[in-house]
Amino acid sequence: MTLNTQEKQKLINTHQNHGTDTGSAEVQVAMLSERISKLSNHLQKNIHDFSSRQGLLKMIGQRKRLLNYLRDKSNKRYTDIITKLKLRG
């Protein structure tokens, strides 16, 4: 359920704002979305893994807080990350 180094680097390169950006809200949302996706697949196979389910809910909450922060700071950055990651219909 964790991301390996190559996956992290690919996400950083795709969503960074400048050359040395590794911690912007966009990068964090992209990494959380990837981890959420992997954990969701795990939970579909392992229905009774309640501790992983709790971790999934925490990650979803963290992503929601980051997206709210982005929406408050810059609506353009918010809509860009939403469309890139296909989070909302």
From Swiss-Prot:
Protein origin, superkingdom: Bacteria
Alphabetical list of InterPro entries matching this protein: Ribosomal_uS15, Ribosomal_uS15_bac-type, uS15_NS1_RNA-bd_sf
GO CC list: cytosolic small ribosomal subunit
Chain intervals for the UniProt region annotation (Disordered): 1-23
Molecular function per GO: rRNA binding; structural constituent of ribosome
Keywords for the protein's UniProt record, in alphabetical order: Ribonucleoprotein, Ribosomal protein, RNA-binding, rRNA-binding
PROSITE patterns found in the cross-reference section: RIBOSOMAL_S15 (PS00362)
SUPFAM superfamilies assigned: S15/NS1 RNA-binding domain
Pfam family, one: Ribosomal_S15
GO biological process terms on file: translation
Family per record: Belongs to the universal ribosomal protein uS15 family.
Subunit field text: Part of the 30S ribosomal subunit. Forms a bridge to the 50S subunit in the 70S ribosome, contacting the 23S rRNA.
Known function: One of the primary rRNA binding proteins, it binds directly to 16S rRNA where it helps nucleate assembly of the platform of the 30S subunit by binding and bridging several RNA helices of the 16S rRNA.
UniProt xrefs under HAMAP family: Ribosomal_uS15_B
The protein's name in its UniProt record: Small ribosomal subunit protein uS15
Gene: rpsO
